[in-house]
Amino acid sequence: MAKIEMKTPLVEMDGDEMTRILWKMIKDELILPFVDLKTEYYDLGLPNRDATADQVTMDAALANKKYGVSVKCATITPNAQRVEEYKLHEMWKSPNGTIRAVLDGTVFRAPIMIDSIQPVVKNWKKPITIARHAYGDVYKCTEFRIPGAGKAELVFTGADGSQQRATVFDFEGAGVLQGQYNKDDSIRSFARSCFNYALDVKQDLWFGAKDTISKKYDHTFKDIFQETYDAEYKEKFEAAGITYFYSLIDDIVARVIRSEGGFVWACKNYDGDVMSDMVSTAFGSLAMMTSVLVSPDGKYEYEAAHGTVTRHYYKYLKGEKTSTNPMATIFAWSGAFKKRGELDNLPELVHFGEALEAASLQTLNEGIMTKDLCGLAEGITPTAVDSEGFIKAIRERLEAKLA
C-alpha cells in the first residue's frame, strides 16, 4: 500500500517521561507505516530545554506560527524537585504557557467518548468542549492582607498624569484586598478564537459571566463578545446553522447540567479552570481529554490534556510493563493530521486522521483497554492490556480500515 503523502510539515514537539515513550510507539506503529510523515522536529524534553536555555520552546512556537499546525507531546513544567532531579540551570517556565503567549491562543478541551463509559450526568450524550480564557483576572492579581483600620482605594494614573480613583472599602479592622485586570485586546482575541472554533466544529457557542453584579468588569466581556459576534461572525454562524448564546454564568451552569452536550462552552479564566475539571471528571477520565490551542488568526496546536505520567515512567525505567493510556496523545496526532489535510486540501490525510480515531474507539468499544479504563467500563467484560498491546490492537483495526 502506498503511503499517504503530505505537502506541508507538521511542527512536531517531543516531550518528557512516559508520554515521550508513548510518542515513539505511536509514531512507529500507527503513523510511519501509513504516512510519508513530514515534520519539523523540536525536542521539548526537559534536558534539551535546559541545554538550549529554553530557546527550543520559543523556536517551536514560532514554527507553529509559520506552518499553522503542530502536535505536542506532554512536557514537564519544573518545580524545585525537578530542578534538583534534572540538575537544571534554572526553573524553566511552562512550555504550554510560552506557546500560548506566542500564539495568543485559547485552549479547547473535549472528552473522547466511548459506548462503555457513560458520563456521570446521565443526559450528556455528546462531548462538551471547554474554552478557557487563560489570561489575567485572579491569575494575574495583586493582593495583600490589610493589617487594620484604613481606606482601600482603586487608583488609575493615565499616561498624561491624570487620575481616576474610587474607594473600594473603609476597613474598620483587619481584612484582605485584591486587584485584578484584563485587556480588551485579550478578551477580543479570546472571543475570535471561540467563534472560529465553533465554526470549525459546527457547534453552538455558549458564554456566561456575571454582568448583573460586575457591571464594568464582566459586562466588558459580555459586550466585547457581542460586538465581535455582530460585526464578524453573525452571518457565518447563521450560514452554518449554529447559534451564539449568552447568559449569566449560574444559568449557564444549570443549562449545561440539563443539556445533552454537543456545544462549545467559553469560560472566563477562573470559571474555565474549575469547570474543565468538573466536565472531564464527569465524562470519565482526564486520560480521555483532547486539547487544542487555537489562535485568533487560525493557528492550531494539538496535544493531550494530561501530564507526563511520571509514576509509570519510573516503572518503565525499571523494565516493568506499564498500562499507560495513549488515547489523548493518539487524538492529538489525528487532530493535527485532519487539520493539516483540510488546510492543504489532502482528503487522504483527513481520512487517515478519521480512520486512526475510529480504530482507536473500535478497540475500546470491543473491550480492549488500558487498566485505568477497565474500572470505569460498564456492560462489557474488559481485557486489560499494556500500552504496547493496546497500540498493536489499534494498528490491526487501522490496517483493516485503510485496506
What kind of feature is each model-predicted range?
Residues 2-6, 18, 22-23, 28-53, ...:
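N-terminal alpha-helical transmembrane segments of multi-pass membrane transport
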Residues 6-25, 154-247:
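Glycine-rich phosphate/diphosphate-binding loop of Rossmann-like nucleotide-binding domains
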Residues 35-41, 201-209, 233-246, 341-353, ...:
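Flexible, glycine/charged-enriched surface loops at secondary-structure junctions
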Residues 46-60, 222-263:
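N-terminal small/polar loop signature for handling phosphorylated ligands or for N-terminal nucleophile
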Residues 47-159, 163, 270, 274:
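N-terminal glycine-rich phosphate/adenylate-binding segment common to multiple enzyme folds
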Residues 256-355, 362-366:
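Glycine-rich phosphate/nucleotide-binding loop
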Residues 319-324, 342-403:
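Internal helix-turn-beta structural module
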